[in-house]
Amino acid sequence: MFIDEDYVNIVPQDLLERGIRLREEYGIYDIAWRFDDVMEVLKIAKSKDMVIVGGDVYRLSGNKPIITYDSWSIKEGDDGDDAFELAVRYITNYRARNGDDFAYCPAIGPYTILQEPNEQTEK
């Protein structure tokens, strides 16, 4: 999985700056984004053949993230397109039910993480 430092090479600087870093608050080397920004991050990840294997939701108090313990994840056998659609659907539904005071931290990695270990070495 990518960590916060990896996003420098993935998303534009302005999008990176709007992200909420989780390192200081929770010791997690990752970034959460508000709804519109996370949707952009997901589109960028898909366009770069990356996969979203799941993610976590944080409630925002001001700009401070608070763990909700809500999350989503793909199932064994899901492909990259399924993972993207699941993330979009989960986040969109979560926002519709709970409002805008949330940030979403997608777990993004290279597409190869969906392959079996022997498939990765055969290439």
List each model region and its residues.
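Amphipathic alpha-helical binding modules
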Residues: 81-122
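Long, contiguous N-terminal structural blocks used for assembly/anchoring
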Residues: 1-33
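Short, solvent-exposed polar/charged micro-motifs at secondary-structure junctions
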Residues: 35-40, 62-69, 111-121
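Acidic, low-complexity, intrinsically disordered interaction modules
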Residues: 47-92, 96
